[in-house]
């Protein structure tokens, strides 16, 4: 499965959650405006940041085991896989009671150049979006589902 390197979190604790203005285009969430159109790649920190490491909305969640980058396609594919499993397992009960929160946002643009292009002439055009994920960060939260259904959806 896509989320093999992530854990299921079950403790209910309150945390601060920052909200960003996002735009949705073709099932992709990305920031409405950024200060610059192109950013540097940067490095992912190895440590654990205190923000976003505790559940804030639901009863269950997925927690990252290590730091890294998640593309907007991976976030959307995981969200669709989780929702699809709940729809199959719980039929109409999930539509009435269940809810999923996506706690990560792909907010950093990634640039790329076409293949077989000579070196130089700038950085390239933005091709996609990524999210930097630190160790211990909550990625998805779920509510209105049982613990067994949540475990099956994430494995």
From Swiss-Prot:
It is found in: Mitochondrion. GO terms for molecular function: rRNA binding; structural constituent of ribosome. The keyword Phosphoprotein does not apply. Keywords: Mitochondrion, Ribonucleoprotein, Ribosomal protein. GO terms for cellular component: mitochondrial large ribosomal subunit. Gene3D superfamilies: Ribosomal protein L10e/L16 (3.90.1170.10). PROSITE patterns: RIBOSOMAL_L16_1, RIBOSOMAL_L16_2. GO terms for biological process: mitochondrial translation. Belongs to the universal ribosomal protein uL16 family. NCBIfam families: rplP_bact (TIGR01164). PANTHER family: 50S/60S RIBOSOMAL PROTEIN L16, LARGE RIBOSOMAL SUBUNIT PROTEIN UL16M. This is Large ribosomal subunit protein uL16m. The gene is RPL16.
């Amino acid at each position: 499965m896509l989320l093999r390197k992530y854990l299921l979190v079950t403790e209910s604790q309150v945390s601060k959650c920052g909200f960003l203005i996002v735009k949705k285009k073709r099932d992709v969430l990305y920031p409405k405006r950024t200060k610059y159109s192109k950013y540097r790649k940067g490095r992912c920190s190895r440590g654990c940041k205190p923000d976003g490491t505790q559940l804030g909305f639901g009863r269950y969640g997925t927690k990252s085991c290590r730091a890294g980058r998640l593309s907007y396609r991976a976030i959307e594919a995981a969200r669709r896989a989780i929702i699809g499993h709940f729809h199959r397992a719980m039929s109409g009960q999930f539509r009435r009671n269940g809810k999923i929160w996506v706690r990560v946002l792909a907010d950093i643009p990634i640039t790329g150049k076409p293949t077989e292009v000579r070196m130089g002439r700038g950085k390239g055009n933005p091709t996609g979006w990524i999210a930097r994920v630190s160790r211990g960060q909550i990625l998805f939260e779920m509510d209105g589902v049982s613990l067994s259904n949540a475990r099956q959806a994430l494995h």
